[in-house]
């Protein structure tokens, strides 16, 4: 089904987002609800939705703001969270995830968004979109709440690949710097390399080698390298970009999520403990609400796959309408600034001796 847009905007003004409607834990209803939130806030955003046509069309027809803003592409197969990436690669044609990536590959859409299986999404994205020249391992970058002026730091890799050698870490630094410059409007981002200490003699061999490589590139690439940083700096203001391997990065963000949940639960318990504490919670409510808004993970939901010939945003699998809308907002911003082209130019600008042989 292809709905007529009925809009007065020119074709060039549109940002078309390809959405895997079947990937999330909450099902297509939450994904379509997220599209609805985005459509009401962003009149220049249009959607190609992938999933069983009858089911998706019925959900779209219930949302007034989506009328004339969506094309539904029939895809009856679904990639589940339990599917192994190797199995998905062999049997993915006809799935909503495959179809969503294909829309970026064939130029129908600028960015793909999926709440689905991370490993499968990365595998399909690498196969269908291919890696940028000079990139050995793509990375997943997320915005992590911080005390910096912009409110977030860029953290990568957070799970694309558990291994990373010195050359990979250099490329992560350049890709993360490009993301911070274009996505957070930081003209000269500060980059830190995550380690067990800040002293130059600490850490594994590949970290020490990466230290030298990144340091050499800071002036040619236009960023400031602050050296080694520790786990406490991920949410601090020492740097804007934190570079690490996918194993460490994934543990870091999930530890952060768990800690945030623990603190939230303990606060609720404390405020419910006595009548006086319940009264105090009412007095503190405006401040607590502002705090929640600042650190709400749904506001920055979306990991960006960096290093591919196309932009893919991975939303949290359990995202609700607010979370999906945040991922779509991020996707639209990246499409608007033509981020993939800028990233490709940045990676291609490395001196020949620094590129992967």
From Swiss-Prot:
Localisation per UniProt entry: Cytoplasm
Cited InterPro entries: FA_synthesis (IPR003664), Phospholipid_synth_PlsX-like (IPR012281)
Annotated Gene Ontology cellular component terms: cytoplasm
Keyword Acetylation: no
Gene Ontology annotations of biological process type: fatty acid biosynthetic process; phospholipid biosynthetic process
Enzyme kind, highest EC tier: transferase
Pfam families in alphabetical order: FA_synthesis
EC number assigned by the record: 2.3.1.274
GO MF annotation terms: phosphate:acyl-[acyl carrier protein] acyltransferase activity
Catalysed reactions, as listed in the record: a fatty acyl-[ACP] + phosphate = an acyl phosphate + holo-[ACP]
Keywords: Cytoplasm, Lipid biosynthesis, Lipid metabolism, Phospholipid biosynthesis, Phospholipid metabolism, Transferase
Function: Catalyzes the reversible formation of acyl-phosphate (acyl-PO(4)) from acyl-[acyl-carrier-protein] (acyl-ACP). This enzyme utilizes acyl-ACP as fatty acyl donor, but not acyl-CoA.
Subunit note: Homodimer. Probably interacts with PlsY.
Family, as annotated: Belongs to the PlsX family.
PANTHER family: FATTY ACID/PHOSPHOLIPID SYNTHESIS PROTEIN PLSX (PTHR30100), PHOSPHATE ACYLTRANSFERASE (PTHR30100:SF1)
The protein, known as: Phosphate acyltransferase
């Amino acid at each position: 089904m292809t709905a007529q847009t009925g809009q007065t905007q020119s074709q060039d003004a549109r940002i078309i987002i390809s959405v895997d409607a079947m990937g999330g834990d909450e099902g297509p209803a939450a994904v379509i609800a997220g599209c609805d939130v985005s459509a009401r806030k962003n009149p220049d955003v249009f959607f190609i939705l992938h999933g069983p046509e009858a089911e998706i069309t019925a959900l779209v027809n219930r949302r007034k703001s989506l009328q004339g803003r969506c094309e539904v592409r029939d895809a009856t197969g679904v990639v589940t969270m339990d599917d192994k990436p190797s199995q998905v690669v062999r049997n993915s044609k006809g799935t909503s995830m495959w179809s969503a990536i294909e829309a970026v590959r064939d130029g129908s859409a600028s960015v793909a968004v999926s709440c689905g299986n991370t490993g499968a999404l990365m595998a399909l994205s690498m196969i269908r979109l291919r890696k940028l020249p000079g990139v050995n391992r793509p990375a997943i970058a997320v915005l992590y709440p911080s005390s910096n002026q912009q409110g977030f730091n860029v953290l990568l890799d957070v799970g694309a690949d558990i291994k990373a050698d010195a050359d990979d870490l250099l490329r992560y630094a350049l890709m993360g710097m490009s993301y911070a410059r274009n996505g957070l409007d930081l003209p000269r981002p500060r980059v830190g390399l995550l380690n067990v200490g800040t002293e130059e003699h600490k850490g594994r061999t590949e970290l020490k080698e990466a230290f030298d490589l990144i340091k050499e590139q800071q002036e040619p690439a236009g960023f400031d390298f602050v050296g080694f940083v520790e786990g406490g700096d991920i949410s601090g203001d020492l740097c804007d970009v934190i570079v690490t391997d996918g194993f460490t990065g994934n543990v870091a963000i999930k530890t952060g999520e768990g800690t945030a949940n623990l603190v939230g639960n303990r606060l609720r318990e404390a405020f419910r403990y006595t009548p006086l504490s319940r009264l105090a919670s009412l007095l503190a409510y405006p401040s607590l609400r502002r705090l929640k808004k600042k650190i709400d993970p749904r506001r920055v939901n979306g990991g960006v796959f960096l290093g591919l010939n196309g932009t893919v945003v991975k939303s949290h699998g359990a995202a609700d309408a607010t979370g999906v809308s945040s991922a779509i907002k991020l996707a639209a911003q990246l499409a608007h600034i033509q981020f993939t082209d800028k990233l490709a130019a940045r990676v291609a600008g490395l001196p020949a001796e620094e590129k992967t042989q």
